[in-house]
């Protein structure tokens, strides 16, 4: 089980790698999405705001009504954010759940894949 602090650190690192990745920036260039990241086993929830493809700093807690929600155990989420596990396989196995429009989910999948492959 990852702590809230470990999950926050992993998420910050993930967002930094995403912003530095050219393929991610191209994929997200016109994407606006308010995303909630929620751990199901510890009290850890974060808001990620993407405006015009730019990843804003991660915020503690949940803000406003999200376009996309990502839920999973703290360990599964941290392993994905650190790049230790393939996000697609975790999603297919049901370890991670997403809720939102198909377009937002597909963009998140593309972003996760590009970051994972670039590690």
Label the predicted regions.
Residues 1-119:
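Feature captures hydrophobic
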């Amino acid at each position: 089980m990852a702590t809230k602090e470990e999950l926050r650190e992993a998420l910050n690192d993930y967002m930094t790698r995403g912003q530095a990745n050219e393929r991610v920036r191209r994929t997200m260039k016109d994407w606006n999405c308010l995303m909630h990241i929620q751990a199901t086993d510890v009290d850890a929830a974060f808001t990620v705001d993407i405006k015009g493809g730019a990843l804003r700093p991660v915020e503690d807690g949940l803000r406003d009504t999200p376009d996309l929600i990502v839920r999973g155990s703290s360990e599964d989420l941290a392993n994905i954010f650190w790049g230790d596990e393939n996000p697609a396989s975790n999603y297919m196995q049901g370890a991670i759940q997403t809720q939102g429009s198909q377009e937002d989910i597909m963009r998140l999948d593309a972003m996760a894949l590009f970051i994972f492959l670039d590690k």
